[in-house]
UniProtKB/Swiss-Prot annotation:
SMART domains: CHZ. This is Histone H2A.Z-specific chaperone CHZ1. Belongs to the CHZ1 family. Residues 1-172 are annotated as: Disordered. Residues 1-10, 54-68, 121-139 have a biased composition (Basic and acidic residues). The gene is CHZ1. Forms a heterotrimer with H2A.Z-H2B, stabilizing the association of the histone dimer. Also, with a lower affinity, forms a heterotrimer with H2A-H2B. Residues 160-172 have a biased composition (Pro residues). Keywords: Chaperone, Nucleus. Pfam families: CHZ.
Length: 172
């Protein structure tokens, strides 16, 4: 077993030793990669170099336009004011149209005029109150506190003793 391990190690070491042909091909590859990397570096430098934009031509054009407008200055000012007024009117028209659209989308039949929501049913509360009085169902909700105490006693453990009510005169 130990001999097999030594043989494997020697084989691996022998495989790692470079041949003369491998050395030559590796040297060629490294030289080619160096040339390619320097060429890429030069290309990158030239791409990074940017000239500052020359605005002098633009300035000259603007100066010429200003001179031309100075001769007809009054007419242009009136035109610009009327354009501004037109824009304001257009914006106001658009706003009014939007408001009208909002109001047209609202269905007045869905507006609740009373303070109670009934999920679409129209209820006359006066009539329902009269019907409840006739049936004797008025005042049912008044006795809720007593019902709660009765329900509590029903659910209590029968083996557990009931707590004695505390009297206001006894010291705590």
């Amino acid at each position: 077993m130990a001999e097999e391990i030594k043989d494997k190690q020697e084989f691996q070491i022998g495989a790692e030793e470079p041949d003369s042909s491998n050395v030559a091909s590796q040297a060629k590859r490294s030289a080619e990669s160096e040339l390619a990397s320097t060429a890429d570096a030069n290309d990158k430098k030239s791409k990074k170099k940017r000239r500052r934009r020359n605005y002098d031509d633009l300035d000259e054009k603007i100066a010429q336009e200003d001179k031309a407008s100075a001769t007809s200055g009054a007419n242009k000012e009136e035109d610009s004011e009327s354009e501004v007024d037109d824009e304001k009117l257009d914006q106001m028209m658009v706003k009014e149209d939007e408001e009208e659209d909002d109001l047209s989308e609202i269905d007045s039949s869905n507006i609740i005029t009373t303070g109670r929501r009934t999920r679409g049913k129209i209820i006359d509360y006066k009539k329902t109150a009269e019907k409840l009085e006739k049936n004797g169902e008025v005042g049912k909700d008044d006795d809720d506190d007593e019902d709660d105490e009765e329900n509590d006693e029903e659910f209590k453990d029968p083996a557990a003793p009931a707590p004695a009510p505390a009297s206001p005169t006894e010291p705590k």
